[in-house]
């Protein structure tokens, strides 16, 4: 093996994938690592395999409840929103970015660790827009699945085999569904929320592709006036939505 010179791992953190906690190297210094590890990879692209795909991306905007916008506004101004039993705290920029990311899609995780659905608007928007169509939904936060389940009821599953063998729709967390699976039985891929990772953006939107199906229709559901469009602008340009990007762009 080779010793990599330079502090390439200073931004390594931990990520909770639901089934366990792993080291997250997405913020490692790629410019230092890439020249070392590139020679150990074999790249075989879709073009090399004899086919190329196209992704038709559509962005739809959803009006959230007035109460949702009020919570976001108060959090940005006061850095805390207190309820009768719980509190939403944004005493650091990292927390503010995370809480706004949650709130603008209709859920929030309190300081106690408990999560709550505060707005079903996106869920009903998706249900109404794609009524009668078989869709695959990507969500970001765990509570968002509960929101979608409340809206779709028995028409929603998180089991791929059930999805493939029934008329049910499927909802998967972006980080666990972005690679290694096929959602080709869905007519459309719908994003309830968006991830901060550019890798998640590029990998997950190709889940409908097969050799026979080379054109995919993807829909992004953003809250009007929310944070999602800022995230999209960053990750679609192959840049993670980091704290520094949040600070620079969110108030533009």
Regions inferred by a protein language model and the residue ranges of each:
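A conserved SF2-helicase RecA2
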Residues: 199-202, 209-252
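A short helix-loop-helix "switch/interaction" segment in the helical subdomain of ASCE P-loop NTPases
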Residues: 19-28, 58-64
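Conserved nucleotide-binding/hydrolysis micro-motifs of P-loop NTPases
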Residues: 65-68, 143-144, 177-178, 195-197, ...
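Post-DEXD/H (motif II) to motif III coupling segment of the RecA-like Helicase ATP-binding lobe
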Residues: 10, 35-39
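Conserved Helicase C-terminal RecA-like lobe
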Residues: 51-184, 188, 246-252
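Conserved RecA-like helicase motor core of SF1/SF2 enzymes
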Residues: 175, 180-214
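Short, charged, surface-exposed secondary-structure boundary motifs
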Residues: 161-171, 198-206, 229-230
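Single conserved hydrophobic/aromatic residue that forms the stacking wall/gate
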Residues: 1-16
